[in-house]
Amino acid sequence: METCLIYITAPNAEEAVAIGRDLVEREFAACANVHSPIVSIYRWEGAIQEDSEVVLIAKTRRDLVDELSARVADIHSYDCPCVVALPIEGG
């Protein structure tokens, strides 16, 4: 079974926790960890932005990544949420 870490950013801890809980309840993720705060620097609509954000890391199977990503897109407050799958090697 291939497993992945899913890296997701959110605007605040409340939203990150809500997303993590939803993913675990729906069995899209086995576990979710919320890490706070981080500073994100990115380009949006032609301008450099700098914001405080929260990172959610979800642990899941590779075959659930597409469904998990679609669910995050449905419930996330961002127009274009960051959802990145990283394969787990070892552990």
Segments the model singles out, each with a brief description of its role:
Residues 1-91:
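Positively charged, small/polar-rich N-terminal and surface patches that mediate targeting and assembly
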